[in-house]
UniProtKB/Swiss-Prot annotation:
This is UPF0246 protein TERTU_4575. It comes from the Bacteria. GO terms for cellular component: cytosol. HAMAP family: UPF0246. One of its GO terms (biological process) is response to hydroperoxide. Belongs to the UPF0246 family. It holds the Pfam family H2O2_YaaD.
């Protein structure tokens, strides 16, 4: 069983890391090729491409210029510890044990606009490049064209090694669009988190993102390899809702 999640725009390169282990991203050569193109952009081009302020455009221009191989612990840190969005608040990897990191390294992957697919302990330098960014490149009009079948092929590698041919999709739609389900050698289950509001269950973005991280941590800390056991997830008041679920979409609801 393999879990996939999205990266985050917010980063943490200051907190002390709780593990000395690190690995190298599998698609680093592709990332380097992509970065060669990004380095040609002026600060205002970065702002326009990403739809961000001039200040953030300059920050990410500088990140592109500073990005260089080899990635080491001096200029990069482990992906699971570098990202700091709502999903990662829920994951709380800074409190992982050595066993948690080992299990995550086998069973968790992070989809990335720059790196394609990341293992939790793969070193990443500071960057921002969302998968939906329409950055024209030698392979096509955007990042989906750039990555083509490579993301799916990279996910198939651990899927072949794991006992259960199931992929738990805890990534956003923007990132999961980089995966080609027809070529994925796994059944896809997408957990959905809904909260009670104004008389009905709704997806509330902040809560849903955090819940994706919480479920990832639940699977990792309990070393779950049987997808059916995910239905027992009850952290933060969520419960599996069989009436709202189907084979490919498992709905978890919460009344606050």
């Amino acid at each position: 069983m393999l879990i996939v999640i999205s990266p985050a725009k917010n980063l943490d390169y200051d907190s002390p890391v709780p593990t000395a282990k690190s690995t190298k991203a599998a698609l680093l050569d592709d990332a380097s090729e992509l970065m060669d193109g990004l380095k040609t952009l002026a600060p205002q081009d970065v702002s326009q491409l990403m739809g961000i302020s001039d200040k953030l455009g300059l920050l990410n221009y500088d990140r592109f210029q500073d990005w260089q191989l080899p990635l080491t612990k001096k200029n990069a840190r482990q992906a699971l510890l570098a990202f700091k969005g709502d999903v990662y608040v829920g994951l709380d990897a800074y409190n992982f044990s050595a066993e948690d990191f080992d299990f995550a390294q086998q069973h968790l992957r992070i989809l990335s606009g720059l790196y394609g697919v990341l293992k939790p302990l793969d070193l990443v330098a500071p960057y921002r490049l969302e998968m939906g960014t329409r950055f024209a490149n030698d392979r096509g009009k955007d990042l989906y064209a750039f990555w083509g079948d490579k993301v799916t092929a990279e996910l198939n590698k651990p899927i072949k090694k794991l006992a259960s041919n199931t992929l738990i999709n805890l990534a956003s739609n923007e990132y999961f669009k980089s995966v080609k389900p027809a070529h994925l050698q796994a059944q896809i289950i997408t957990p959905v988190f809904k909260d009670w509001k104004n008389g009905t269950y709704k997806i509330i973005s902040f809560f849903a993102k955090k819940a994706r991280g919480r479920m990832s941590a639940y699977i990792i800390k309990n070393q779950i390899t049987d997808p059916e056991l995910i239905k027992q997830f009850d952290w933060d008041g969520y419960q599996y809702n069989s009436a709202m679920s189907d084979a490919g979409q498992w709905v978890f609801t919460r009344k606050q």
